[in-house]
């Protein structure tokens, strides 16, 4: 049984709050000119590297269009191969469909979804996954999640 880890993108892996106006207005073509205003969230790169070292498959599930997500991921050099974006499913978060799509792409039968919003929590629960929240919905930062993820993965194997 393979345990997968899925992340939300905006405000979970990358602080894209500086792009909010562009995102709200769907000005996707202007995003590349503003990527320098974004930053990887504290602990994100370290968590990704630790999970990859342990052989856990990783993916991103976002409500953003693929073009936008790929630009953000590429700019910051996040080494995550699986991406489920807005147009990959007909239903969107808080529905289970995008999370299930990500799990299928990871070839994982169980896992955890990590996000910053209630729709992330709802999507994880609807998909039958564990959920770990980052601020603002939970005080736990990414840098402190490795132990909890290991415990969840261990529970699924036993």
Walk through the language-model features, giving the residues of each:
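Active-site neighborhood of HAD-like aspartate-dependent phosphohydrolases
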Residues: 1-42
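Short, conserved structural micro-motifs that define repeat-unit consensus positions
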Residues: 57-58, 115
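Conserved phosphate-coupling serine/threonine residues in phosphotransfer and NTP-handling enzymes
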Residues: 62-64
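A generic structural signal for short coil/turn motifs at secondary-structure boundaries
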Residues: 59-60, 78
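Short amphipathic alpha-helical segments, especially helix-boundary/capping motifs
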Residues: 20-26, 43-46, 74-78, 97
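Catalytic-core regions built around general acid/base machinery
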Residues: 43-55
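Asp-based, Mg2+/Mn2+-dependent phosphohydrolase catalytic module
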Residues: 1-5, 37-39, 50-52, 66, ...
């Amino acid at each position: 049984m393979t345990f997968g880890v899925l992340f939300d993108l905006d405000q979970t892996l990358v602080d894209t709050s500086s792009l909010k106006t562009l995102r709200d207005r769907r000005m996707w073509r202007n995003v590349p000119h503003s990527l320098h205003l974004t930053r990887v969230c504290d602990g994100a790169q370290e968590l990704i590297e630790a999970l990859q070292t342990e052989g856990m498959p990783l993916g991103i599930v976002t409500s953003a269009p693929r073009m936008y997500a790929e630009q953000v991921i590429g700019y910051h050099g996040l080494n995550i191969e699986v991406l489920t974006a807005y147009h990959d499913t007909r239903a969107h978060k808080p529905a289970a469909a995008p999370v299930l799509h990500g799990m299928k792409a990871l070839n994982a039968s169980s896992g955890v979804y990590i996000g910053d919003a209630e729709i992330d929590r709802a999507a994880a629960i609807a998909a039958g996954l564990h959920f770990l929240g980052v601020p603002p919905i939970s005080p736990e930062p990414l840098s402190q999640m490795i132990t909890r993820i290991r415990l969840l993965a261990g529970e699924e194997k036993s």
